[in-house]
Amino acid sequence: MSIKAEEISALIKQQLEKYDDKLNVNEVGTVTYVGDGIARAHGLNNVLSSELLQFSNGSYGIAQNLEANDVGIIILGRFDDIREGDQVKRTGRIMEVPVGDQLIGRVVNPLGQPVDGLGEIKTDKTRPIESKAPGVMDRQSVNQPLQTGIKAIDALVPIGRGQRELIIGDRKTGKTALALDTIINQKGQDVICIYVAIGQKESTVKNSVETLKRFGAMDYTIVVEAGPSEPAPMLYIAPYAGTAMGEEFMYNGKDVLIVFDDLSKQAVAYREISLLLRRPPGREAYPGDVFYLHSRLLERSAKLNKKLGGGSMTALPFIQTQAGDISAYIPTNVISITDGQIFLEADLFFAGTRPAINAGESVSRVGGSAQIKAMKKVAGTLRVDLASYRELESFAQFGSDLDQATQAKLNRGRRTVEVLKQPLHKPLPVEDEVLILYALTHGFLDAIPVPDIQRYELELYDYFASNYNDLLDVIRTTGDLPEEDKLNEALKNFNEGFSISKK
């Protein structure tokens, strides 16, 4: 059998056409040190800051320190099976997390992996954990309220959609309870909620998730959990991962509420990473860029303009203080970044005033823009009244004779404090809040003894729901007060039928 020369040349041509001269070039380095959640690698000369790197065992890390001879890497997840001499290669991208509707109702870790035992999350959408905050022209002013269902907040320090409101206070002063109540109150409000638990005990997070399930709030909530047993890098990236998940909804025109519980633990984790990477320590041993750590996170929460879909992301960052000291380094940093703060005071909490909001130290820089008209009318003088009551109270305890006007102010103040108290996990619809505050500010509670106030409040809601639902509907639908004559008449009728407790 003879082989023809044409066949050979045709075969060679065919093979040459198939030849692909593209080479897959991976820049690979060598691990020179590993321990405490960080690694150092030599040979990654072109690596970029915050680039995702892959170790030979499949683990990932983020390039954090770019030095002359080596690269400081924070390891995401387990590091006990990474050894000196192992290979680490560049991926050419920054870290991304899965995003989308499929995450709603799930508990995930900062890498977006499920930790609730309900199977894998099937989503093909991802977003980078670090992204540029919307610019000045991409935003619009905050003008729509985010109702928390907590009278003291909605009346004194209102929160708007797209605002960043700091919740600050000592441990065990009700910070988490405040956030959970706010999430529970978003039911039916078309708001997606994200709860980021940073360094919280596993048992605490489990209780929080159970509470949200009990009230049906997990139907619109994502929980991102980085437990205290996780390496410091996981606690550090958790808030950024949660924000990336929220941005997916915000840029699709939806309203998002994100809670960071709490950023003090993230700052401590970042301090640990920085010290291990031999970065120079500054005040309280924090690195010099700890302000930027929080500012670049919180600036991503915004109310977008109509051109970008008009979505919003409202952030409630938590900071834990030591003995009520809000002038420490991290608290002052976050106060200066946010649009106001709600200060929870331990003394008020243990005195039975819950939520333990210190009205004098708390402020909302958005203010009345984030309130419906009815709430603006009834809560206008509440803060001033409360402040003057606190001032008068300190004089009154000396037992000196008080004139009638001062006594009236003290009586109104005591009733104000009582009205602003609220039981755990009982957020109120805005029309009920307006109703009780209207009754308070228009003197309908002045003759009611302080111990009867809470019973009065509950009976008032039931009475109006049964007999004057049309008046509540006006507040609910228009956001304004109904005709004052009708409202006064209804309150007068209720007061006549209310029985005061016998002493």
From Swiss-Prot:
Keyword flag Isomerase: no
GO molecular function (one): ATP binding
PROSITE patterns for the chain: ATPASE_ALPHA_BETA
Record key words, sorted: ATP synthesis, ATP-binding, Cell membrane, CF(1), Hydrogen ion transport, Ion transport, Membrane, Nucleotide-binding, Translocase, Transport
InterPro entries: ATP_synth_asu-like_sf, ATP_synth_asu_C, ATP_synth_asu_C_sf, ATP_synth_F1_a_nt-bd_dom, ATP_synth_F1_asu, ATPase_a/bsu_AS, ATPase_F1/V1/A1_a/bsu_N, ATPase_F1/V1/A1_a/bsu_N_sf
Alphabetized HAMAP family for the sequence: ATP_synth_alpha_bact
Protein family per UniProt: Belongs to the ATPase alpha/beta chains family.
PANTHER family recorded: ATP SYNTHASE SUBUNIT ALPHA, MITOCHONDRIAL (PTHR48082:SF2)
Name listed for the protein in its UniProt record: ATP synthase subunit alpha
Gene name tied to this protein: atpA
